Structure formats: structure tokens, C-alpha cells
Amino acid sequence: MKKLLLAASIVYFASACLAEEKTTPFLSNSDTKIKLEGFYLFESGYIKQNHLILFDKNVTDNRKKLGFYTEVAFAATITKTINDVIAGAKIVLQPTTKAKTAASYNGSHIFIETSYGKVELGSPVDASAKLRVTGNKVTAGTGGWYRYALLDGQYMRYNGLKPDFDTNVNFYLESYSNSFDQINEKTEKARRLNFFTPKMKGFQAGISYTPDTANTGGNKNINNLTLQSSGRNGISVSRTGIKTFALGNGETMTINQNIRDAFSAGLTYEHAISEDADLKLSMTGEYGKPARRLIHSKVDGTTKTIEVLNTYKLSNLKAYNLGAVFTYGNFSCGASYSNLGKSLTSKEYYKVGRNTYYYNGAVAYGQGPIKTSLAYLKASRYKNTVNAVSLATEYKIMPGLLPYAEISHFQAKGKPVYYPEAPSKTTRGTVGLIGTKLKF
């Protein structure tokens, strides 16, 4: 408790030192504008969790319960307007710490906007991600308890395999990134084409096309699907969207969950019911075909050669999300339901279960500079479940500067999907967070 109070004192002092009002910088002439925007998060987290063994107890390399976390974004948007046509580019810089990859900050791309809508070329953020509504839209704090929890530690494993858990609402088209051997390996997602309609009577729609989710637009090695560099029909040596699981006796299952010819779309509706009441509804979805098959292979212990024993078809990507946010005066509430079905799974490996779905809800109350929220998440991934409840509060010292405190309790229950005979195990814990968000 003393350590958490010390961290709180540091965060408060830093917030007070930064409490000088600033506005978003603009540079402009008659038809060209440059907008600079950024985000910085500093957070301290304290966790207490059961069933952790040896170094699983460590939050960082040398500390068991206390850890710091930082997240940064900085972007410049350059626009030029000619005859009611806006053309521009958004350029996101790579920071020296964890990059914030939210849709509002991430995504270097070119765009053209007219009265007929907006086209984005090369954006890594798809239409469904930008138009999706979840309960977290109304919450205070960050909901970042999962950064400190370990749900697949040694206690939860069976025959060396980990159970699969989701700790927030995840969708395939925004899950993958490419490694550039830089400080941060989670900065780039697949490149795509986006189109958004203008808002008309409260409605707005968007659609995206992604040829290949392994194509980030900057891959250092496009030979992404080779069998030990000897062809294009075997096991990939890249980590982009690909997982390999050891089954014992030299056998492995390699699952390439990249997608080709992927489409995503969304539709939102906003309505002012009265002077004090507003409603926002959203429906989004994703569809695509698996890029490769699941590969069952075996490595010879002496020669180290790889023998492909069999390949299995993965199911198509089919996912959707339904969400709503209602605001009345100082009160807000949000809820969403997401279903990924059996997307990109095969019965030969996913023996315990193949379906994934999420329930997410939150209520919030704001009065002046203070906002408090209560949020709930249930995530079920292949019958492995996570339940989490978070209570958070934040205080706006000035526009853009938000110190916050948050406490979350979570429980995860499940087993590796390849072993239906494995016992289901449970781990639970509590995470306390204190931090500061700065936006400009």
C-alpha cells in the first residue's frame, strides 16, 4: 500500500507541474493547414493475483507487484483545400516507448474528402474499428488492468500449452502488426482502402478493403510464407499473424490467421432525443478468407528436417459488433455485444471450443471536472472465459490533462484448446492503477 501511495504522489506532482493550459497547434496559410496532436500516458500499476509460480509473479524483470507503463502518440495532419476538395496526409511518428495504437492516433495515410465522402489510402485502421461502439466509450481511466495480469502462467498450462484468453474486445483485422526490429514491435497493421460517407440525418457508413493482413506496407521481408526458405507452400518463418504450438514428440501445429480479401463495414446513427439526452447506435462487421491452412508438421530430431503430416482448412472470418451509448445529463451508459463465431479456427486443433464472443457494459457519471465509471467485461474465447469489473475516476485539471485512479477485479477460467481432457483452472486477482493522461 505504501508503494502505491508513493506512486500516486509522483503522478500527482507530475500532473500539477503540467497544469498549464495548451491548445492544439495549427500552422496554416490560405489553403494549407498543419495540425499537430499528441498523447502521453504515464501509469503505475499494483497487482495481487493467485496461482502464480516463480517468475510468473514478476510484473517487471525484478519487481513482483509494482510496474510502470507509458504510452505515446504524436501525429501531424496536413491538409490542402481547393474548390471544396480537401486532400491531405496524416503522418504518425514512431516514439521511443509504447506507441498508442488507438484509431484516433494511429495510422499514417493519405486522404481525400469531398461532399460525397472521404477516401483513405493506406490507412492501417479499418472502417469497422473507427465506427465501432463499445461500453468502454463512456469510461474513465484506461481499463488497462490486463497489462499487469498474467492469465496463461505455468499453473494454467497443460502439457506445455497455454490457454487462450481475451482481456478486451478484439477483432482480427486490427490485431496484427509487423516487426521492424525497432523498440516497439506493435506499431503497424495491414494497409487498406477506406471509404466513409458524410453524416446524413445522423447516419454515417464506412467500408474497407484489405487484400492481405500480412501486408503492412513496410515489411522488411515479404518472403512471409516459406518452409525453411525452400518454397511458398509450407510453414512461415515470420511472426506476422502466425502462431506455432509444440505438441510433443517433435510435432507442431502452425496456425496462420492472416486474411486475404478482407472486407469490413460499419453503420452508425446519432440522435439528439432532447436537449439533455443523446443516443448513438453502431453496427459493424468483418468478413474475409483465411490466407493459409493449419499445418500439422514434425521435425526430425537428428536431421532437423520438417515433414508436413497434414494440413487443415480454417473457417472464414465472420464477425460483428452491436453497440449503443446513451447519455442523459451527467449520466452515460454504454453496452455492446460482439461475436466472432468460429472465425479462423479448425476442429483438428480447437478441440475444446471454437466460438468467441464478448459482452461489455459501463455506466458513468460526470460532475464538473470529475468523472466516475463502473465497467464490466465478459470475454469467452474457445470456452475460456474472462470476467472483469473496473471502478475508475478521473479529474480534469485542465483541458487535456487527466489524472486518474482505477481498481479492477478479474477472474480467468479455462484450459488449452487442444486438450479437452485437461482440467479447467482458475486464476483471479486485483489490479490498482494510478496515472495521468495528457492530450494536446
From Swiss-Prot:
Taxonomic superkingdom = Bacteria
InterPro entries the UniProt entry points to: Gram_neg_porin_domain, Porin_dom_sf
Pfam families given for it?
Answer: Porin_4 (PF13609)
**Keyword Signal attached:** yes
Task: Please give the Gene Ontology molecular function terms for this protein.
Answer: porin activity
A GO cellular component annotated for this chain's UniProt record is: membrane
Q: Where is the signal peptide?
A: 1-19
Keywords on record: Signal
- Keyword Signal assigned: yes
Q: Known SUPFAM superfamilies for this protein? A: Porins (SSF56935)
- What name does the UniProt record give this protein? Uncharacterized protein RP068
